[in-house]
Amino acid sequence: MATKSLSETALVAVIGDEDVVTGFLLAGVGQKDKKKNENFLVVDSKTSQAKIETAFKSFTTRNDIAIIMITQKVADEIRYLIDEYHQVIPTILEIPSKDHPYDPKKDSVMLKVKKMTGSD
């Protein structure tokens, strides 16, 4: 597996509903690079799957992002992309949202860990 080098400052990217993204932005996570690319995407009922896919693909190829936080509800919409993603950096972390609790049985990272450790 090829390793990816990070730029000097590694960012956290966030994909989720307005409440989750706003919380991370208030904590100082939000950034815009020189090309005006943001490291977050607010997803609502009008956000197309294509827009979510584009943001995810963009975040996974950027050298300045080390972690992608994505609400599990949104992750379910692009589950096939997350399941196909095998790089260590950026790491994908599925998180709960206000209205949708976290289910470890759906989390790709948790499933990979269980498979590697042989636990159920």
Curated annotation (Swiss-Prot):
Record-level Gene Ontology MF annotations: proton-transporting ATPase activity, rotational mechanism
Record GO cellular component, one term: membrane
Highest taxon above the source species: Eukaryota
Keyword terms, alphabetized: Hydrogen ion transport, Ion transport, Transport
One Pfam family, short name: ATP-synt_F
InterPro entries, per database record: ATPase_V1-cplx_f_g_su, ATPase_V1-cplx_fsu_euk, ATPase_V1_fsu_sf
UniProt keyword Membrane, yes or no: no
Free-text function comment from the UniProt entry: Subunit of the peripheral V1 complex of vacuolar ATPase essential for assembly or catalytic function. V-ATPase is responsible for acidifying a variety of intracellular compartments in eukaryotic cells.
Assembly notes: V-ATPase is a heteromultimeric enzyme composed of a peripheral catalytic V1 complex (components A to H) attached to an integral membrane V0 proton pore complex (components: a, c, c', c'' and d).
Protein name: V-type proton ATPase subunit F
Gene: vatF
